[in-house]
Amino acid sequence: MTLLAKRKERSIVPRMYYITTAIDYTNGPPHIGHAYEKVLADVLARWHRMKGEEVYFLTGVDQHGQKVQQTAEKLGITPQEHVDNITAKFLALWERLGISNDGWASTTDPRHKACVQKILTNLKDRGQLYKKSYKGFYSVRQEQFLTDKERDAEGSFGPEWGEVVELEEENWYFRLTDHVEWMKKFVEKSSGFVLPAFRKAEVLNAIDFDSDLCISRPKSRLSWGIELPFDPEFVTYVWFDALINYVSFAGYLAEPDSELPEFSKLWPADCEVIGKDILVPAHGVYWPAMLHAMGFSDEEMPTLLVHGWWNINGEKMSKSIGNVVDPNLLAEQFGPEPVRYYLVRDITTGKDANFDADRLVMLYNTELANDLGNLCNRSINMTRRYCDSVISDAEEYDDEASKALRVTMDQAVTLFSKYMDDNMVSDALAALNAQVSACNAYIEQQQPWQLAKDEAAAPRLRCVLRHLLECCAQTGYLIGCVLPDASARILDQLNAADLFRDRTPDTLAWGILPSGHRINDPAPVFPRILSEEEKAKLAEKAARTAKKQG
């Protein structure tokens, strides 16, 4: 099918929400930056599923390149064995963190190789690829030739480029410069190509170049890659290969029996989640130019969602400094969901943040254990104690404080939805936290434990508990895109899972829990994370108790 035919077909094919992440380089195990990106994308994917959209969430691994080949040689194993070992570590972490990806991209997959080679052949046939000899400086770490633009004020190549060597060799080039004027116009007029919007200037500045892109490496120094279909002495440059994963695993140019999605349902990607370090030139320059050369229109360009970095004491994480945070150790120490919560709560999408395990504990204990967890536990316990676990008639009693709580709950749903649609997860969670605080203030104001002592106040008591349970239910439902396990436990205790099964956030309205609804028994959803000092005090207390009993 031609691209034009696919465009026409797309207008009648139901669209899916297509969200991707950068594919992780398999030269070393995952760190906290990898985990943040995948959790952020997972939260957004779950949010769009909650909205009733059909979602396709793709993540994966980048398995080719010189660094992989060199590391495998040092270890005395094949590159395939090395990437298989590292890939297994990524897969295990994503399972542990509850990453709900629908597709998995690995660049050694034969389907990806076939797509890359078809694209290379098509580009060559269109005159977009040519061969020439070039002499210049080459970054072994970044696996690319450098220009004078990469030099610092002293005229040197900075430490971010690692070892830089002078090379002269023949290679294949992509006519990147053919697309400069188009890219400038496209990026300038586009409001949705790169988000947050402040990243747009960075892309525009990067478009100002006058050299083409080397897209091959001679097999004489790199054999671990996808062979050029028209020149078997060369393999494909790792970035050119890797970027194509966004279309290859979406079914682009795939064979009918490939078991890949239908491309016309997915493309263009609604959200490609990437780190700021790979915005330019890879995703902000190379990728749109490649797509344009392949025949994609302005309307068929993806949206890039660019996130910031987790720093340590203001410094970028680095193996050489020794400050890399292992997400597996975090999940083992605190649990997967506290880690998920922290990674999207303590950072603004698009900005940098400073990683702090003490803040992870503080945010979890304050916002989840003390606030939301305590609210749910108290509300369910009091309903069991005072109302035999049954929700009363909604028309029985009302007052101004209860009316105000209904208004703030509706506002919280609206704000949460707005922020999530804007990919601002931390702000969305802040809106929910504000409502939880309003509920806890409502409890202190109404004092249901005092109302229970006065038989004449029984209608008011039942009204208070009904309002608290409704807020717990709606809050517990919404937080499910961030904390799916905790959400399920809250709704289970409220016996409300079926009541929310066919709902979407835009259909939330007061009164989801019906009159006469019976809830289940409470159980702590967010047990506090204890400090070492608290653990020591508890152990000391337990020892004293045991001594007395002995």
Language model regions located:
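Basic, alpha-helical terminal appendages of large translation-related enzymes
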Residues: T2-M16, Y56, G60, K132-F137, ...
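Generic structural concept
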Residues: A369, G373, R406, D410, ...
